[in-house]
Design a protein with these regions (language model features):
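Histidine-anchored nucleotide/phosphate-binding helix
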Residues: 109-120
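A short, basic/flexible loop-to-alpha-helix module at the beginning of a structural domain
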Residues: 84-96
Length: 228
């Protein structure tokens, strides 16, 4: 175990799985962290935030003051061992050959970091990431996404902030108000060839799904995962 702070109360945790050469998962999946409490096991799912890389993987999570497992993880020290359950989940890139739009808020960025760092260097179809946070310091992994966009023309990074500083010159407001910006490179007759992936809190996910359906997206084109 190792970790670093990404933003206030948000940490990036790095883990090494002993005894295996490759930790097998599909980008976008989650693992469950196990905390022993009074002889019982408390499980909490967390999306893997890293691409496939040997026997290592990463998590990105915020500290919930009353959260048992997040507090447990935030109290760990480098080198401590953690029990996990194997990767699961279907929030993965369904059609790598199709154009994709990713929409995330907060730590909902975790599965998208895993997908982007894994897929963008290897694939040509355009991918746009619309990432919404409250303030500029909450733009988790910002430097990585900006570097990725600079290196690969097929990737666009659109951060938006609801409480911007006066110096901020990018998009402002919620992601719900910038769906058309994310779809800007798609002609109306190309909508049927675009998949949209959404990850974040329930209210945002539900709002974005409604907006997408009103623009002609079908249920199969909208892949989502809700965080509590």
């Amino acid at each position: 175990l190792n970790w670093k702070e990404l933003a206030p109360e948000v940490h990036h945790f790095e883990f090494e799985v002993p005894g295996v050469e490759h930790f097998s998962f599909t980008p976008g999946q989650f693992i469950s962290v196990v905390e022993p409490v009074d002889g019982k096991e408390i499980l909490r799912p967390y999306s893997i935030a890293s691409p496939r890389s040997g026997n290592r993987f990463s998590l990105c999570l915020n500290h919930v003051p009353d959260g048992l497992v997040s507090t447990y993880l935030f109290d760990l020290k480098p080198g401590d061992e953690v029990k996990i359950h194997e990767p699961l989940g279907y929030f993965t890139l369904r059609h790598p050959a199709r154009r994709a739009v990713f929409i995330a808020t907060g730590t909902g960025i975790a599965p998208f970091r895993s997908m982007l760092l894994d897929h963008v260097p290897r694939t040509k179809p355009p991918i746009t990431l619309l990432f919404g946070v409250r303030c500029e310091e909450g733009l988790l992994y910002r430097a990585e996404f900006e570097k990725l966009a600079a290196e690969y023309p097929s990737f666009r990074f659109l951060p938006t902030i609801t409480r911007p500083n006066p110096s901020w010159t990018g998009l402002t407001g919620r992601v719900q108000s910038h769906i058309d910006d994310a779809l800007a490179l798609c002609a109306p007759d190309e909508i049927s060839n675009v998949d949209v992936y959404v990850c974040g809190l329930k209210e945002m996910v539900d709002d974005v799904r409604k907006e997408l359906k009103s623009r002609g997206f079908t249920r199969k084109q909208i892949i989502y995962e809700k965080y509590n």
